[in-house]
Amino acid sequence: MRTPARYKRFTNWRSLATAATAALMATLLTPVAAHSAPRESAPVYSYENAIRESVWVDTKLDGDSDGKTDRVAVDIVRPREPAQQGRKVPVIMDASPYYSCCGRGNESQLKTYDANGDVVQMPLYYDNYFVPRGYAFVGVDLAGTNRSDGCVDVGGRSDVQSAKAVVDWLNGRAKGYTSRTGTTKAKAGWTNGKTGMIGKSYDGTIANGVAATGVEGLETIVPIAAISSWYDYYFAKGAPLYDSGPEWLSDYVESPDARARCAAVQQKIVDGAPRTGDWTKFWTERDYVKDVRKVDASVFVIHGMQDLNVRPKHFGQWWDGLAENGVDRKIWLSQTGHVDPFDFRRAEWADTLHRWFDHELLGYDNGIDDEPMADIERAPDQWVTSDVWPPRATDTVSLRPAKGAQAGVGTLSLRTGSGTETFTDDPRQDETDWAAQIDQSTSAKAGFTTKPLTRDVRLSGSSKVTVTATPTTSSAHLSAVLVDLGPDTIRDYSASGEGISTLTDRTCWGPSTTGDSSCFKVTRAKTANVDYTVFSRGWADLGNHASDAKGEPLTPGKRYTITLDLHASDHVVPAGHRLALIIAGTDEGLIDPPSSTPTLALDLARTKASVPLVGGAAAFARATSGSSYVTPDATLDGIGEPRATHRVPGGTH
């Protein structure tokens, strides 16, 4: 997303081309014609009479080793009238492994078909809403799922090529057929090739992966709660986030016939993703961040800042890479967990997505590129904007822990501390246990708090915590969390809806047919009153101290230093609250425990939190002046225990 004109903006071929086109149009159009140029696509085409068809696109891969290249099923809904008039339309595409196994959206919708095999129900509202407005909607079954050939390889070459091949077909560079096994070719003469990819979780992940190939014709992507590097879905610097690997996921989403023929691919996944947490070529292939320089499409990122399925590190590192490479971009950050914006900000989302696609795919000058880059949910259903994100005044500040009056109850300031604090890993405790007892001396954590703030402090971006620790055993896992200490009302991201409640009433978003309703259940924010909020977290295996790529056994009694990458966030700690850093061992429910139960001694002089503060160190100094440290001896109330509730990116509530 280009930043407002008053800021220096990145310039690339897209903005140059847009400027050139605008200049040409200005010279050719009369004032009346220029004034009447469309700013919004209108629902003028019939959805009921739309063309519904299926095509199988050749991926040029043979993932299942049957001697034939794999074809992926492509279900299409497109307006009939432009086709009759010889006018070409752009495409909105959602490539997914979930269309037959698991469903899409809050209501877990599946594709359904008529007797001819053409799609009847296309999950979600995109086809109902956008086809009448002059777009085609395309739902792609990834290789190894539903009606496609091949095997699921969990974000690898086959998954990405499944969708990239369709973009190529839409632009006349790949072969398509009217059936899965036949020889009758199908061409996409009805489209101008301009494609936008969208999807939540696994679907949005594929959009990231295809964009990272730089494929021509992909104009924009809208990744919602999407993975940017598959290693970071399963591990955090060697620490396992789940008790199973990607082989479980591929088996879960594959069609029954693919499951029967893809044993060799399954074994490659097992071999390539060892439970040691070591980085392998398998993970390199599935790291889209390394190829972010190839991204030519604009990117509209949406992510929940409390997403404990696809954790916010994914959008943070992807966003930073996009910024470094001058990609046009926009972002929404909610207080929810793994939730689609259709279910936490429905009307605004439909309008914004409509204008985004109109701008990126139809070329309408509707002003969305001059609006603030970021929308951030500051409190349930209360949103603020930021012209750029993170704000330009953001600077990384080193906050230092120091000893306090009680063991494990220390201070956090700009001054370097000294001495040690000791804790023992308790795999039965999690971040809510630690935060609830932040002002009490407990054996399982070391906590450090600022003075009560006299001014608001805003953290915006990704934090890091560098820990120097001496373990008593040969293995140790570390957790670090940032906590806002003070009363608040937040979305209850630990509840089953991850911050939303689903009601019985419905709202409709476009026309419906007998087999495809545009009406979806209404949702509302599910909130909790809390005494603290954990707003950023990170983990690591101390055995990875020397290398992010490979761990090693620890020597008991030896001092090690490691840096934990905390999740990206945008959070305001208000005046009167305190900011806390907690360092502990296993964060139960969010990482697996180590093979032993270590006690760790923190070297406070060599431990720090590097946090992105708007206004930098000066803002922090002002906010912590004029008050004194407090240590109330009380147990604080928070949400329920956090859990990595799914091993499936995009799992339903």
Where is each model-derived feature located?
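N-terminal cap/lid segment of alpha/beta-hydrolase-fold proteins
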Residues: 41-87, 453
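Short beta-strand element of the alpha/beta-hydrolase
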Residues: 87-97
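C-terminal, loop-rich substrate-recognition/catalytic regions characterized by aromatic stacking residues
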Residues: 38-41, 346-653
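Catalytic nucleophile-loop/oxyanion-hole region of alpha/beta-hydrolase
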Residues: 146-165, 174-177, 341-349
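Short beta-strand/loop motif that positions the catalytic acidic residue
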Residues: 295, 301-303, 307
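Secretory targeting and sorting signals
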Residues: 2-36
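Accessory cap/linker subdomain of secreted extracellular hydrolases
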Residues: 42, 61-63, 67-70, 103-104, ...
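Conserved alpha/beta-hydrolase "acid-adjacent" motif
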Residues: 308-314
